[in-house]
A protein has these predicted regions:
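Beta1-alpha1 glycine-rich phosphate/pyrophosphate-binding loop at the start
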Residues: 23, 29-30, 35-104, 175, ...
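Phosphate-coordination loops involved in phosphoryl transfer and adenosine-cofactor binding
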Residues: 34-36, 110, 173-175, 230, ...
């Protein structure tokens, strides 16, 4: 995730939450043309896959979703993507990636995929009552961060509340920031933020952390980190300039207190966006798609790239690289199995 990539709308994707059941289609119209490849999702993984597939003359079709460009469309500054020494805005980068891919033949539709049928080839991709046929699919739908949904949170996404310290920590130099969570991610984010922030307060609703011992001790022993247990966010506070703090609630007795902070990082987990696949592709215990051979999934002809697969890096540059790999894998697979 790049700078201020804090809205896990969907790194690729669909405007629907992963918890939204896929709609069954009682009446669909079939497109007679069988596409070489359909890319589901956009973002850096999807657009890069589209660029490479287009250059390979595969005539790729992308369903980018209503939030075309994914989370980066709500990213103010990207400073860690090579080639932009002065940084670049997220929407601008996504526009450039899209235009570049379209120049080489990517066809983009800003519509959501409802469901897919992978039981036989050609595969069926259903979009708002239309079913498209394709020899192969690249899934680039990403993963969405879990949010607290506390009062005042929606207004401060992008103005101080983030889900990626690696991306956004540098914006809070010499400031006080909060980290909410109790796992490895929360402890790692808190420790990372001490590089920039003057103080980091780690807030957890229990006194037992799910984090590994080494990650917890690293945070607990850092002089710039204060750990507050049995606390949860009741409400976010802000003014016209952005986040100013939060109201903390004691999970034991219900008492409240106000804490001042200009930044906050929510680290309570992610969920990959794979519901539309209907369980037809193998995933791990957390729902992330599993690669079986290079970027191919458990279903031959179905490939995946970006945060829908990535459980470790979650960066725009790694998503783009995986999108490139997926397109090359698709080209080779089509040569061997279809053309």
């Amino acid at each position: 995730c790049p700078c201020f990539s804090i809205f896990w709308l969907h790194l690729g994707l669909m405007g629907e939450s992963s918890n939204t059941p896929a709609r069954s289609q009682s009446s669909v119209s079939y497109m007679s043309e069988v596409r070489n490849v359909i890319i589901i999702g956009s973002g850096p993984a999807g657009y890069t896959a589209g660029l490479y597939a287009g250059r390979a003359m595969l005539n790729p079709l992308m369903f980018a979703g209503y939030m075309s460009g994914g989370q980066l469309m709500l990213t103010s500054d990207i400073e860690n993507f090579p080639g932009y020494p002065e940084g670049i805005g997220g929407p601008e980068m996504m526009m450039q990636l899209r235009e570049q891919a379209e120049r080489f033949g990517l066809e983009v539709e800003d519509r959501n995929v409802d469901e897919v049928d992978l039981s036989e080839r050609p595969f069926k991709v259903t979009v708002e009552g239309e079913t498209f046929l394709t020899h192969s699919i690249i899934v680039c739908t990403g993963a969405e961060s879990l949010w607290l949904d506390a009062p005042g949170e929606a207004e401060q996404k992008g103005r101080g509340i983030s889900t990626c310290a690696t991306c956004d920590g540098a914006f809070f130099r010499n400031e006080h920031v909060l980290v909410i969570g109790g796992g490895d991610s929360a402890c790692e984010e808190a420790t990372f933020l001490t590089r920039f922030a003057s103080k980091v307060t780690l807030i957890h609703r229990r006194d037992v952390f799910k984090a590994s011992t080494i990650m917890y001790e690293r945070a607990a022993n850092n002089p710039k980190i204060e750990i507050r247990t049995f606390r949860q966010i009741k409400e976010w506070l802000s003014d016209d300039k952005g986040l100013t703090g939060a109201v903390l609630e004691n999970t034991q007795d219900g008492s409240t207190e106000t804490i001042e902070a200009t930044g906050a990082f929510i680290a309570i987990g992610h969920t990959p966006i794979t519901n539309f696949l209907g369980g037809q592709v193998e995933t791990d215990e957390n729902g992330y798609i599993v690669h079986k051979e290079h970027t191919m999934t458990s279903v031959p002809g179905v490939f995946a790239a970006g945060d829908v697969v990535d459980t470790r890096y979650k960066q725009a540059i790694t998503a783009a690289g995986m999108g490139c790999s997926a397109a090359i894998d698709v080209e080779k697979w089509l040569e061997e199995n279809v053309h």
